[in-house]
Amino acid sequence: MADTEEGFGLPSTPVDSEAKELQAEAKQDPQLGTTSKAPTSPQAAFTQQGMEGIKVFLHERELWLKFHEVGTEMIITKAGRRMFPSYKVKVTGLNPKTKYILLMDIVPADDHRYKFADNKWSVTGKAEPAMPGRLYVHPDSPATGAHWMRQLVSFQKLKLTNNHLDPFGHIILNSMHKYQPRLHIVKADENNGFGSKNTAFCTHVFPETAFIAVTSYQNHKITQLKIENNPFAKGFRGSDDMELHRMSRMQSKEYPVVPRSTVRQKVSSNHSPFSGETRVLSTSSNLGSQYQCENGVSSTSQDLLPPTNPYPISQEHSQIYHCTKRKDEECSTTEHPYKKPYMETSPAEEDPFYRSSYPQQQGLNTSYRTESAQRQACMYASSAPPTDPVPSLEDISCNTWPSVPSYSSCTVSAMQPMDRLPYQHFSAHFTSGPLMPRLSSVANHTSPQIGDTHSMFQHQTSVSHQPIVRQCGPQTGIQSPPSSLQPAEFLYSHGVPRTLSPHQYHSVHGVGMVPEWSENS
């Protein structure tokens, strides 16, 4: 390796002449790896007083030698790239109480430009003009000699760049040029700085740290060495066969290895919103959906277990279980042997699904209330004879209900004069989610008398031009419409007989379907 005079100078520093004298004596120094200036003149002796006993040792010198034998390459990028191997040294012989400044610079090793061909480096021309030399000052500087000698001095944060306009203080290098790193130990002056003519310093050079700057690795051997030794290059390594073998030997019968996919399936099934008490709790979150069964979950009767209620309830709450179970079974694709037509069911049969009246409960299950809301169209009857076959109760489910036209598409059989009974369009139809809360809010907002169901019923039966009103108490079924009402007063026609037996309905507690109107309104 050729070492030129300008290669080992400290450019743009006031001690440039002393650096040249240091480089001239370094060629005569038989010891490789360390360079120290001997006093040759009174001025030089004064400058270097107290710096003679300093020794520097390169850390991981064997690794550096491996790279040096092949031809060390260092990547340079526009943003800056760190060196590997990192430049780390061990310093001895410093005055423990004196403050020192440690810094590095990287200078051209020769005036040649290189190329890599035929698995070797060769000179291809004259070197480009060197960039202005930059000094990298160690972040701990200035510090006492005791601090520097206590541990390794690492310059791993130093970065190399090929951006000539780099504003971050990185070392600027040219690609395909050879460079030599140098370490400088400078005794700090009274201002904790350096640069004056009387500044004492020493420079240490390790030839095995020389490298060629490249934008991408040229020698595949260097690439392999960096992958094998750089802990940050583990992403380029393959799977470690020895590690897999060691893990396979650690497996035993007592602790079998379970695939992660199986664990995820078990966890998702345990926390499914359709199993156990989690399913009951999740029904409240489905209030915003149109129907709870539209999520497309199909299950068999063996998979549907009774929901576990964390609160103790009385026996009269059994309809919560039945309605929830029935709704899950309606979502099933299997045929049930106990299906019964809706119109053929008699009130004498003890079927919990068709009981005419239930004790009024404040905390009804969400699925029960939603199912009741889905059947509200059955309660709007008219005197027109049914032309189509009446569907069964099991057919009126979440899967077939969208075929029923909404209120917005229903035709009006007859219209009362505007002064007697103005047409009130029913704003909340069945496709807008749960019906019960919206009807209550509309009724309470329109007429304050709707809140009391008993007084409402008594008042509306005395008015001859009121729509049909359904009312039920805790111990009574659904009331039939008054006989004084005419068929023309029914606003909606669905082809269902007017007089239906009470057992064909679910009871809805305290809900006025149409706001109250009077002659004076």
Curated annotation (Swiss-Prot):
GO cellular component: actin cytoskeleton; actin filament; chromatin; cytoplasm; nucleus; protein-containing complex; protein-DNA complex; stress fiber
Region ranges (Disordered): 1-45, 254-281, 332-352
UniProt cross-references to CDD domains, sorted A to Z: T-box_TBX4_5-like
Compositionally biased region (Basic and acidic residues): 17-28
Segments of the chain annotated as binding DNA: 63-238
Biased amino acid composition, Polar residues: 31-45, 262-281
Disulfide bonds, paired cysteine numbers: none
An example Gene Ontology molecular-function term: sequence-specific DNA binding
Any Pfam family the entry gives: T-box
Keywords: Cytoplasm, DNA-binding, Nucleus, Transcription, Transcription regulation
GO process terms (BP): animal organ development; cardiac left ventricle formation; cell fate specification; cell-cell signaling; embryonic forelimb morphogenesis; embryonic limb morphogenesis; heart development; hindlimb morphogenesis
Main location: nucleus
Gene3D superfamilies tied to this protein: Transcription factor, T-box
Coiled-coil region: none
Cellular localization per UniProt: Nucleus; Cytoplasm
InterPro entries: p53-like_TF_DNA-bd_sf (IPR008967), T-box_DNA-bd (IPR046360), T-box_sf (IPR036960), TF_T-box (IPR001699), TF_T-box_CS (IPR018186)
Subunit details: Monomer. Homodimer (via the T-box); binds DNA as homodimer.
Notes concerning its domains: The T-Box domain binds to double-stranded DNA.
Function field: DNA-binding protein that regulates the transcription of several genes and is involved in heart development and limb pattern formation. May bind to the core DNA motif of promoters.
Protein name: T-box transcription factor TBX5
Organism: Gallus gallus (Chicken)
